[in-house]
Amino acid sequence: VLLIIAILGCVQDTHGQELVVNGSFEDHSKCPRSVAPNKLKGISNVRSVASSPTYFNSCSQVVGVPQNWAGHQTAKDGEGYMGMVLTSQNGDRTDRQYVQLELKEPLQNGHRYAVSFWVNAADGSGYVTDRIGACFTTMDRSRKGVLHDLIGKPDLENPLDRFLSDTTAWMKVDGTYNAKGGERFLIVGNFQRYGYSSRKAMIPNSGNSVLANVESNYLEMNDPDPDRGRFLRALSKQAYCLLDEVSVVPLGSNVSVDLLTQERACAI
């Protein structure tokens, strides 16, 4: 039997296909109503791990976009974004927050993926840092909030000394990830230990001093909302950033080759 090896056009081209579900945080069933953490309830396919970030959306009067208790910033894409603590100058060295996003399908072993997200330093943040990254995982870490095995091992990280200090423009963090296979979730946050998390005062006391204890101008505000005032005081000792437009895109395509027998060829 004559066998003709032919490409039948069965090409599975995934190049350019966005894999992150709700990466711009637009799909939500509830409008955020409070500064207090709420475990990101009502935001489709987005979860917190351990301490909860804050969801900002233009539909809210308290945590709105562009104006909110953390400052003023338009979204990179759409009407919403996340706010998260990366590191802190106060006594709690574990004071940080993480956002977990779900992928449309598991990553494939040996395949390469373009990973990117956009960050912006909140106006009210007392400090800035260069430490933010991303980790892929096969498990849903939001259930138990366990991340200790990922600390010090980010799959993607912002370059050292590239401080996330821009309060106006969004800064892009990107790179390429070689998948192990089976990864279904992406977690964004600071994956370095406290001692490896550089911090600089947003408004240094003198020169370019590091770890200067700067009280934010927000403390001078006579805010009638006690919760908001409490968060503003905490913000003055934190490196707090905004997060938007998280993306994972496959690089290249897969081409499947099939066998074309003489019988199949005649049937076409």
For the regions a language model picked out, list residue spans one by one.
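Extended, low-complexity, turn-rich repeat/linker tracts enriched in Gly/Pro/Ser/Thr and Asp/Glu
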Residues: 120-128, 140
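Short aromatic-acidic-glycine turn motif
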Residues: 139-147
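Aromatic (Trp/Tyr/Phe) and Gly/Pro-enriched flexible surface segments
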Residues: 17-109, 118, 129-131, 146-265
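Beta-strand signatures of extracellular beta-sandwich domains
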Residues: 133-135
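Bacterial Sec-dependent N-terminal signal peptides
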Residues: 1-20
